[in-house]
Design a protein with these regions (language model features):
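An amphipathic, aromatic/His-enriched active-site/gating alpha helix that lines ligand/cofactor pockets
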Residues: 58-87
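Short S/T/G/P-rich N-terminal loop/turn motif that feeds into the first structured element of a domain
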Residues: 1-48, 62-63, 84-124
């Protein structure tokens, strides 16, 4: 399975309210997504939010990410999060990871939001 772990560092209280709006809509989309194996949400503080999802394939994951409410959320990401402290990491695994493992992998990643395809979406 393909696992995706996203850390979202919320900018401020307005960003948190925006996150709640987009997260609700994205979660509704996620529940209907084909190829989703498992999902989880975690917060280490009011401004440090985490999502973890496992997918049958990259194609299934991209179908969710690049459409509907999730795409709208990505286009509005700069109004929600600190783009220099938010990141996503993906890897293949046989077992859905623990939060400790997911956070460790995310923290060890050299991913830079500002150089990602997501940054282009939020500038459109």
């Amino acid at each position: 399975m393909l696992v995706s772990c996203t850390h979202i560092r919320i900018k401020n209280i307005l960003g948190f309210l925006r996150f709640l709006f987009y997260n609700f809509r994205s979660f509704q989309q996620l529940k209907k997504s084909s190829g989703l194996i498992q999902k989880s949400f975690h917060s280490t503080s009011l401004f440090d939010l985490w999502t973890l999802s496992a997918w049958e394939s990259k194609k299934a994951m991209l179908a969710y990410i690049n459409n509907g409410a999730h795409l709208d959320a990505m286009k509005n990401f700069r109004g929600i999060a600190d783009t220099f402290k938010s990141k996503v990491v993906r890897w293949e695994t046989e077992v859905f990871p623990t939060w400790d493992e997911a956070i460790r992998r995310n923290n060890e990643s050299d991913y830079e939001y500002e150089k990602s395809a997501y940054a282009k979406l939020s500038k459109e």
